[in-house]
Amino acid sequence: MTEKLLQMMQEKGYFNQHKKVLVAVSGGADSMSLLHFLYNHQKDLDIQLGIAHVNHKQRQESEYEENYLRHWAKEHKVPFHYSAFSGKFSENAARTFRYDFFKRIMKEADYSALVTAHHADDQAETIFMRLLRGSRLRHLSGICDVRSFGTGQIIRPFLHIPKDQLPVTFHFEDRSNSSLAYLRNRIRLTYLPTLSQENPKFKEHLCLLADEIALMDKALEELTKDITITDLSVFQQQTDAVQHLLIQSYLESFPDLQLSKGQFNQLMSFLRKKTSGKMPLKNGYVLVKTQTDFLITKEEPISLSSPSLLEFGKSIVFEEYLLTFSEPHVVSNVDTINIWSDAPIVIRHRHEGDRIDLGTHHKKIRRLFIDNKISEKDRQKAIIGEQDGQIIFLYVAGRLYLKKRPKNAILYGTVVIYKKF
């Protein structure tokens, strides 16, 4: 089985882009199996290991386990990174503490990936737990084997392997794993074994379901990539079913905003109406809707505010930027724009149908956002400069897009954009 595991990892290319990887090790069976496997196959996978361990200070044995791992790391010449949990303990608080610690070590010690020992049984448990809690369909895709994390990626190379097929090695037993006081333990020790008596492949089928949902979600993302979700004219042209999926996708940007079915339906009803306004949501969030756009935010965004007028010799503050319009000059390390007219410049956010003359062609601002993969958040903050009824510059996500220089034009002044701190 070890050779099959190695072959699978190589075929999937989990470590092709990584040299230094940080292995999360608790001392339990799964993480110790992962540690020994990766250590024994460092050359095959062309990686260098580091160990990250968090002592949660909840069991007497934790000190011994920490010392064992520290000694093992020293003996095998593997860097050992350690932290002790502090504060009021809960499962969520401990998880947040662990992953914040992992991110910090990745950044400080230049690891490009965190590797964890989640396996197929963990995947089945996660999906079943979400089913019990009434999660939406897209959340039943379960755990990803590779995704962005911190300054690199998190990789779960065992995710498609059942626990009973993992290499067996020395490990510590956490007695809390056998306590039925925890839902996940009840799922692992009671619910899934009972259902597996009806169908021995029940856990496997849960994982296959997750794979199908993940594929469907990926297909939806590709099919809707050119749709600006927060553009009302575009959104309202879609069918009810597509609108439903688009808003679910948009809500993924707000992980601490978990709407009930009733609240979700109210949100959809509000978006389908012709009226503008604000709708309070949960956790301090509000849905803000104008005649042309909408967005969810914790504060009413400047992107829905009135335009400002920038005149020659003056400065204005717009969002987190200070813009000045003065005599032609060069300023190092800031964004500068040459201006070919003395007319005041309207500083605003985008409107439906905005276009800019890039020289070789006119381009819709919306299409420019799509082609350059500008995020929804950055689109809302994009700054447009309009002079004499024409867009002369677009500033978005730290990038400038300029209107073609007028023929035979004489340089009149310079606009400088400073980021405020």
Curated annotation (Swiss-Prot):
- State what protein this is by name: tRNA(Ile)-lysidine synthase
Xref: Pfam families:
ATP_bind_3 (PF01171)
Enzyme class comes to ligase
- What is catalyzed by this enzyme? cytidine(34) in tRNA(Ile2) + L-lysine + ATP = lysidine(34) in tRNA(Ile2) + AMP + diphosphate + H(+)
Superkingdom of the source? Bacteria
Domain remarks in the Swiss-Prot or TrEMBL record: The N-terminal region contains the highly conserved SGGXDS motif, predicted to be a P-loop motif involved in ATP binding.
For this record, the Gene Ontology CC terms, alphabetical, are:
cytoplasm
Task: Tell me what organism the protein belongs to.
Answer: Streptococcus thermophilus (strain ATCC BAA-250 / LMG 18311)
